[in-house]
A protein has these predicted regions:
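Acidic, surface-exposed loops and disordered segments
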Residues: 1-160
């Protein structure tokens, strides 16, 4: 079986991450793969935010927890040190599909590099909130962007654990 098919058949979601940061070069390779996802009409509208700052990561976690309605102290990101947020421009008719393909590329690229991941939802609601709008404004991102999801990653553990 070729390596691509093996990745597609073996990738699974991880719900127990180590706090160790993945190497920057590995993260860059994963993000780069996300930018090569196919998009409708070749618009390439999705944006990938790599959240590596622990304070900001924890703010995302708290916002996501509130939207989820989970108890205080629960981490919807399962302790992952990196969050990759995918946003897609609402002005593009295929924005949800485009962002979803980016998420798939991110998770499959992570798997191919031995990095665990999981798709976490509620990004749409996060970026419709004041919290999300402020993040976009602070980053200078203009336009109507919808959060598609979060890909959380870390180096995969040996054996059945991720």
């Amino acid at each position: 079986m070729n390596d691509t098919l093996k990745v597609l058949e073996t990738r699974r979601s991880c719900r127990n991450f180590k706090p160790d940061m993945i190497p920057e070069e590995t993260l860059e390779q994963i993000v780069r793969a996300g930018t090569y996802a196919p998009t409708g009409m070749g618009k390439q509208s999705p944006i990938i935010l790599a959240v590596t700052n622990k304070e900001l990561r924890d703010q995302f976690s708290e916002e996501n927890r509130k939207i989820m309605g989970a108890p205080v102290g629960m981490d919807p990101f399962y302790g992952a040190p990196v969050i990759l947020v995918v946003l897609a421009n609402k002005a593009v008719p295929t924005h949800v599909y485009d962002g979803s393909l980016v998420m798939g590329n991110l998770m499959n690229a992570a798997e191919s590099l031995g990095v665990a991941s999981i798709w976490i939802h509620r990004a749409k609601e996060e970026f419709e909130s004041d919290f999300g709008k402020k993040i976009l404004a602070d980053l200078g991102i203009q336009g109507e962007y919808e959060g598609i999801g979060h890909c959380r990653s870390e180096e995969r553990r040996v054996g059945k654990e991720c």
